[in-house]
Amino acid sequence: MIRACVAGLLIITCVAACGAPEQEAHFVRLGPETLPDESFEKLPEKQLQPGSLIIYPENMTSFYDHPGEAGFFAFGKEYGFDSLSFVITETHPHGGPPLHTHSVEEAHVLLSGTMEYVVGEQRFKAKAPYIARVPAGVPHAFVNAGDSPLNLIGVLPTKDPDYQPVGPNPLIEAVDAE
């Protein structure tokens, strides 16, 4: 039931945004003021209060994938979700995560900007607003193909997602060369 509600909400959000006149979305700074030279993962600054229905970034584990992607993740098992986990990113121009896989499918929601993806053997660009579907077990990576930072939301249908790096992001050099 929760999955259906979240999927419906995401579809309604995208449909509403797709039908609206083009507007500049507001970027939310999530990561460090200056980008570090190395990747990191840091535990939440504040623990979530029992029974809380709102999860703020300060309650989530923060991360930085070098180069250019900072953000927060909320594994459902730590926040009372039975079958959902979330990632909220601040992805800088030409930045993105390493090539990686998850054992479950993943949805990416982008409300402004343009991302370039590699998903398995497919390579493509997608201009927001959109929802991208990444099949389970398929190596994937993305980069911000625009000139300003953007926020991506990842939704995984499990309370305990895995993340398996496979190699460097094959799009990083490609975007820098363009």
Go through each PLM region and give its residues.
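Bacterial N-terminal signal peptides that target proteins for export
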Residues: 1-6
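C-terminal motif of bacterial Sec signal peptides marking the signal peptidase cleavage site
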Residues: 15-17
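A short, N-terminal "cap"/entry segment at the start of jelly-roll beta-barrel domains
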Residues: 19-83, 167-178
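Conserved short histidine dyad/triad with adjacent acidic residue
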Residues: 71-72, 87-101
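Short, charged/polar surface micro-motifs in flexible loops or helix N-caps
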Residues: 80-82, 92-94, 114
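Glycine- and acidic-residue-biased ligand/ion/polar-headgroup-sensing regions
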Residues: 104-106, 110-115, 120
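Short acidic-glycine-tyrosine-enriched beta hairpin
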Residues: 121-136
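Ligand-binding loop in jelly-roll beta-barrel domains
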Residues: 136-162
